[in-house]
Amino acid sequence: ASASPSPPRLFPLVLCSPSDSVYTVGCAAFDFQPSSIAFTWFDSNNSSVSGMDVIPKVISGPPYRAVSRIQMNQSEGKEKQPFRCRAAHPRGNVEVSVMNPGPIPTPNGIPLFVTMHPPSREDFEGPFRNASILCQTRGRRRPTEVTWYKNGSPVAAAATTATTVGPEVVAESRISVTESEWDTGATFSCVVEGEMRNTSKRMECGLEPVVQQDIAIRVITPSFVDIFISKSATLTCRVSNMVNADGLEVSWWKEKGGKLETALGKRVLQSNGLYTVDGVATVCASEWDGGDGYVCKVNHPDLLFPMEEKMRKTKASNARPPSVYVFPPPTEQLNGNQRLSVTCMAQGFNPPHLFVRWMRNGEPLPQSQSVTSAPMAENPENESYVAYSVLGVGAEEWGAGNVYTCLVGHEALPLQLAQKSVDRASGKASAVNVSLVLADSAAACY
């Protein structure tokens, strides 16, 4: 159900750390509906203030939130404060007075500087999913009073501690905040002897714009090599751009059948500070190869409606197996003691999915000893692809007459596997029994 129409709740905002040259104040509007809102600013002489901006235009909803700020020269701001922020809304207009007093004067003229330090994303990675917000003062005395507020309502904080650092007294007051409180955008305020500092995730210090991104889902098809080895197909549904993974539900379904057992992976932190989680289910390779359809269904508290994404194997209209060629090291490499290159080429195949493995005398070699290219379009007109793999071989190993075999797996090959071998003596293909190479990894699917 949609939120009921309501006017905004307005709160003053100031910088976490005062600037010596730029005067900045702001105001935050919370919980209004509908989203239409307009800010205006007035100075102490009731004159309209220009240079206002809104960050961003409107934040999420419903209900909605928005932030407005003004900036000017420090001396001009001090002269014209306090300022009034007015928010015009269809459900009523509200005002709040705000000023940035800067350093707090004391009876003996010694200033007290107040700063606020929000938690980092890493602070929430502990087992209890909580962190702390720090309000710190520096000066030649301890503050007489520190109070905390959450969205304008008083909250309890830990006792203020103080230490002496040279001529300064550094006092610290902390409040505990859960990851859920921080992620939902709650505003926390620290008031030191009448001076306020604010912080929240969505309005860091009341100034930083927040890049809003919608939750997205993407289905990832199983790889051919995994299907070949395990005889099963892994269906992956990737949910990204989540502020919090709490309440996430991911389920895989057969398009013509029931629900599949779905496992949720660990959440992964994205570069933008949001989270990604994979939902994974497994089906038989025969079902996947047969063209069965599957549906990923996602629900999350931040989604207005559940999301769905379908997936099935795309049949190649012009499927062709690769021709496999193996080449010995070039003559130029044989003249020294450098490492040699044995090359395998898979040519003319479609679809562009295959794997390459190397063996020496019938024994598998580590994949770290070779470099394999991604399939490249050889002839776009008839959907033909080519791929190369280069195996590094020691000069002594090659000279000892070892046989090197290139195994190529592709769905259009007989038994989905082809091989070609080469050695120093013949340079011709050698027969190698590869039926047992992958047998230990093979698994039946029922």
Curated annotation (Swiss-Prot):
Keyword 4Fe-4S: no
InterPro entries cross-referenced by the UniProt entry: CD80_C2-set, Ig-like_dom, Ig-like_dom_sf, Ig-like_fold, Ig/MHC_CS, Ig_C1-set, Immune_Resp_Modulators, Immunoglobulin_dom
UniProtKB keywords: Disulfide bond, Glycoprotein, Immunoglobulin domain
Entry superkingdom: Eukaryota
CH3, as annotated region: 210-316
GO biological process, one term: complement activation, classical pathway
Stretches of the chain forming a coiled coil according to its record: none
Region of interest: CH4: 317-427
Location of the region described as CH2 in the Swiss-Prot/TrEMBL record: 106-209
Disulfide feature: 27-85, 135-190, 237-296, 344-406
Region annotated CH1, chain positions: 1-105
PANTHER family assigned to the protein according to its UniProt record, in alphabetical order: TAPASIN (PTHR23411)
The protein's name in its UniProt record: Ig mu chain C region
Source organism (scientific name): Gallus gallus (Chicken)
